[in-house]
A protein has these predicted regions:
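N-terminal-biased segments
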Residues: 32, 36, 40, 47, ...
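Mid-to-C-terminal alpha-helical segments outside catalytic/metal-binding sites
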Residues: 2-11, 19-114, 145-153, 175-178, ...
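Short acidic, glycine/proline-rich loop/turn micro-motifs
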Residues: 127-130, 254, 368
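Catalytic pocket-lining loop regions of alpha/beta-barrel enzymes
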Residues: 138, 157-160, 165, 170-171, ...
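Histidine-centered catalytic micro-motifs
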Residues: 11-18, 220-224
């Protein structure tokens, strides 16, 4: 297929790095290093695995020392591949996966101006260690300092790595947000799901959101470990002690990806966060988009039914029609296999982000392969999706 030529250089909203084994320990305070660190150790079979102290971690237990090539799953995700054919793995120490100057050279070859840079392991460890709150905060700050070392928050105005933020401790979250903002961060990664008994839009967290709004930082709700396997899947009789490789189909459907993302975004809208902070922006990254039309229809319905005939004004804390609030404040990066045209029709080209998920195997082999999914868009809409929306979020 011959793709149309572009009169602009795209900006990718979803690139990843593969972390080295010392991503949490390099800068970890000494008192946490024995027994309270996210680290790599050998299991009984002699294989490397991620552990917290002596306990094997959950979702991302195996280390990603060898990974499948970029786009390796694309035929399978498109319904055309043979699931029994496994591509040959490549080392995660491949220089462009680990080193920012090599990645910039890769961006040049790929025809990409800039990118949001995101973790692979880093989006998975919060839920594993949240019971030890002090250790969670220490490991997360240490991880962010590794990101600052190896990638930077606005490196050469082309690589925009996002730090991790947890809301389990509001005051810590405010302090860490201020620290990374001072170092040039343009946004942060927020784990999907509730904050262990609270909505992320609970007014308790308003000091944090006020600082995020003031600094102009985008909140990226990236696919990750939401905790649903523990408190939702368990109630359906599912084993809560699973890894990425051992999750059941039911767990993938109900506890991972789209479901926690929808719930999180609905909570931000219905719990009134955007009414209290009207300049906040949220980006849903690597959660897909096929669920967006149904969610907006449901938001419109509950905005009418729950408020007018069921629970009164308190049924929703949103002061405007919820589906309109979503369209104003939420940006969505679809999967390549999603119906991107439907998404544009639903929320407008001004809220759709091009994200390649490179170099993950479930993404595209080369970032601009994504053009195959959007090449029929009008020129102005195409530029919005492929460049301008992300440029505005990053303040490029």
């Amino acid at each position: 297929m011959v793709m149309r030529s572009l009169d602009f250089v795209p900006i990718d909203a979803d690139n990843h790095y593969y972390e080295p084994h010392d991503c949490c320990t390099r800068h970890l305070e000494a008192k946490f290093r024995n027994g309270r660190a996210c680290h790599v150790a050998k299991n009984a079979e002699g294989q490397d695995e991620w552990r917290f102290g002596d306990r094997p971690m959950g979702f991302h237990r195996p280390t990603r020392d060898w990974v499948l090539p970029p786009g390796a799953y694309r035929p399978f995700m498109s319904g055309k591949g043979d699931p029994n054919e496994v591509p040959k793995a490549i080392p995660s120490e491949t220089p462009t996966f680990r080193h920012r100057d090599v990645r910039i050279a890769t961006l040049d070859k790929q025809g990409i101006e800039a990118t949001i840079m995101l973790p692979s392991f880093g989006v998975a460890f919060e839920d594993d260690i949240h019971a030890d709150r002090e250790a969670l905060l220490a490991n997360m700050r240490a991880f962010n300092r590794y990101v600052e070392d190896d990638w930077g928050y606005a490196y050469r105005n082309r690589i925009f790595a996002l730090p991790l933020i947890t809301l389990v401790d509001r005051d810590w979250a405010v302090a860490e947000l201020e620290r990374v903002a001072a170092l040039g961060a343009r946004g942060f990664i927020l784990r999907p799901g509730p904050v262990y008994g609270r909505s992320p839009a609970d007014p308790h967290f308003d000091p944090f959101w006020a600082r995020a709004e003031e600094a102009g930082l985008v909140a990226a709700v990236h696919i990750g470990v939401s905790g649903y396997v523990q408190f939702f899947g368990r109630e359906w009789g599912e084993d809560p002690n699973v890894t990425e490789q051992t999750m059941t189909a039911f767990q993938f459907l109900t506890c991972f990806g789209a479901r926690p993302a929808q719930d999180t975004l609905a909570a931000l809208v219905l719990h009134g966060l955007f009414d209290r902070f009207p300049r906040l922006r949220v980006a849903s990254i690597e959660n897909g988009s096929d669920w967006v039309p149904a969610l907006l229809k449901n938001l419109e319905k509950v905005g009418r039914v729950a408020i007018t005939s069921q629970g009164g004004a308190k049924a929703s804390l949103a002061k405007r029609p919820p589906h309109e609030v979503f369209r104003e404040h939420v940006f969505v990066a679809p999967f390549f296999e999603d119906d991107v045209y439907q998404l544009v029709d639903t929320i407008g080209a001004e809220r759709v982000l091009f994200g390649s998920d490179w170099p993950h195997p479930e993404g595209v082999a080369a970032p601009l392969d994504f053009l195959e999914e959007v090449e029929k868009l009008p020129a102005a809409a195409l530029r919005r999706v492929m460049r301008d929306n992300t440029a505005e979020l990053l303040r490029i």
